[in-house]
From Swiss-Prot:
Name under which the protein is recorded: Ribosome-recycling factor
Family stated for the protein in its record: Belongs to the RRF family.
GO terms of molecular function: ribosomal large subunit binding
Gene name tied to this protein: frr
Gene Ontology CC entries for this record: cytoplasm
Keyword Cytoplasm: yes
Organism: Mesoplasma florum (strain ATCC 33453 / NBRC 100688 / NCTC 11704 / L1) (Acholeplasma florum)
Record's subcellular location: Cytoplasm
Lineage summary: Bacteria, Bacillati, Mycoplasmatota, Mollicutes, Entomoplasmatales
Length: 181
């Protein structure tokens, strides 16, 4: 019984952490190295995250500087950023790749919030699926009485509500960050 709750709680916590990591990559109009976490470069034939092949710094609030450890990767980094859905325009020279982060228009901000809320719903569905699977597991276990199953359902629902509330709170903070000028 406790095992079912512990597994559900861990899976829900993992989902909340995954959401936190996911929204770090959403552009806010300020330069952030985490923006490039999902950008992959072809490093000797292997897709590798940019942050594992280069030093990424933010010398100014609207500027990202990427300094690949292997200078031959500069064009690969530029190509990978151009292919990404970040809508950034990298400029390269012999040593580094510079990316000026343009200020977000209100229309783009609203679109980003809309996109974030759509993705948020997918994470909420994950939480609900964990709830459903955990309750099904408890019901299928013949060694657990009906009263105990009802108690497990109540506890799992509390975990579900708490996890969804956390997702919403994280999203509200990001939305404020996105809508701030």
């Amino acid at each position: 019984m406790d095992e079912i709750l512990l597994i559900a709680e861990q899976q829900m916590e993992d989902t909340v952490v995954a959401w936190q990591e996911h929204i770090k990559t959403i552009r806010t109009g300020r330069a952030s190295a985490t923006m490039l976490d999902k950008v992959m470069v072809n490093y000797y034939g292997t897709p590798t995250p940019v942050n594992q092949t280069a030093q990424i710094s933010t010398p100014e609030p609207q500027l990202l500087v990427i300094k690949p450890w292997d200078k031959t990767l500069i064009q690969e980094v530029v190509a990978a950023i151009n292919k990404s859905d970040l809508n950034l325009n990298p400029v390269s020279d012999a040593e580094v790749v510079r990316i000026n982060i343009p200020a977000l228009t209100e229309e783009i901000r609203k679109d980003l919030v809309k996109k974030m809320n759509k993705e948020l719903e997918n994470f909420k569905v994950r939480i609900r699926n964990i709830r459903r699977d955990s309750i099904d597991t408890a019901k299928k276990d013949k060694s657990i009485s009906e009263d105990v199953v009802k108690g497990i359902e109540t506890d799992i629902q509390k975990l579900t509500d708490s996890s969804i509330k956390q997702l919403d709170e994280i999203s509200k903070v990001k939305e404020k960050e996105l809508m701030a000028i």
